[in-house]
Regions:
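Bacterial N-terminal signal peptides
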Residues: 15-26
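N-terminal secretory signal peptides that target proteins for export/translocation
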Residues: 1-11
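Serine residues within intrinsically disordered or low-complexity segments
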Residues: 10-13, 29
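Extracytoplasmic
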Residues: 30-245
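Generic low-polarity alpha-helical segments
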Residues: 1, 24-28, 72
Length: 245
């Protein structure tokens, strides 16, 4: 489970398609977090770092880029909570055609898609930053959804992170460390732009939230939980963690 808490849901799209996104909730887990001593959560946690035929990196590294779509293995109630069991990106918006990106984790409830550079979908003139092409992201988020990411922290200390995201109407997220709230509510600024004539593209205006979170992290393996708190309608690609100054 997450390490327990709350959140919203995002909308992603494709020509004439407005979708929603999934990723974080307040929910208790099969984990024991009573004293939150270092290692206690990780020892009891039933999820495992993501891996597949292409990604064999194990726990995601901090400092470094932490990919949201590489949330942990373990399923609903352990590695994530989503408002429904259907992946509205992989296998639905992105048809199941046998390709890696279109079918990425399509049997899981977290809604996932990837950036597309045709028809000015994700390489559009309304971006505040240009995202990488074929960048996987968690989308269709709704309040109450969450997902866990196991990370390997090189050295104990304070870290800040930038977030690559889109948000049709703003909202808030939060981040837990080993089952305890570590961030409080974090404001996501809306990327809505009324001058874009294409309605569905409001879910594809990319931006970076600089230093959106500051965490004190112990060295070694830790579990981060991303919660969607309010609004949803966000696409969350990755957090870039660096040592705080």
């Amino acid at each position: 489970m997450p390490l327990a808490r709350r959140v919203p849901r995002s909308i992603l799209s494709w020509p004439a398609l407005v979708v929603t996104f999934a990723a974080a909730v307040t929910c208790a887990s099969a984990i024991n977090y009573q004293d939150n001593q270092k290692g206690a959560l990780y020892q009891d946690y039933k999820g495992t770092p993501y891996q597949d035929s292409r990604y064999q990196g194990g726990a995601q590294k901090i400092p470094g880029r932490v990919e949201c779509a590489y949330y942990d293995l373990g399923g609903e109630g352990v590695a994530y909570h989503d408002s429904d069991a259907k992946n509205h990106g992989s296998g639905e918006l992105n048809h199941a055609d046998g390709t890696y990106l279109n079918q990425f984790r399509m049997d899981e409830g977290v809604d996932i898609s990837y950036t597309k550079f045709h028809d000015q979908i994700d390489n559009n003139p309304f971006n505040l930053v240009q995202p990488p092409e074929n960048q996987l992201y968690v989308g269709w988020t709704e309040p109450g959804e969450w997902f866990n990411i196991t990370v390997q922290v090189a050295r104990a200390g304070f870290y800040t992170a930038d977030l690559l995201y889109t948000s049709n109407r703003g909202g808030t997220i939060s981040m837990d460390l080993n089952g305890k709230d570590a961030s409080g509510p974090l404001t996501i600024v809306s990327t809505f732009n009324a001058t874009d004539p294409i309605a569905w593209r409001q879910w594809h205006h990319w931006n970076v939230a600089r230093n959106i979170v500051r965490l004190r992290l112990p060295a070694g393996k830790n579990v981060l939980t991303v919660h969607i708190l309010t609004e949803g309608n966000m696409n969350l690609a990755y957090f870039d963690f660096k040592k705080a100054r």
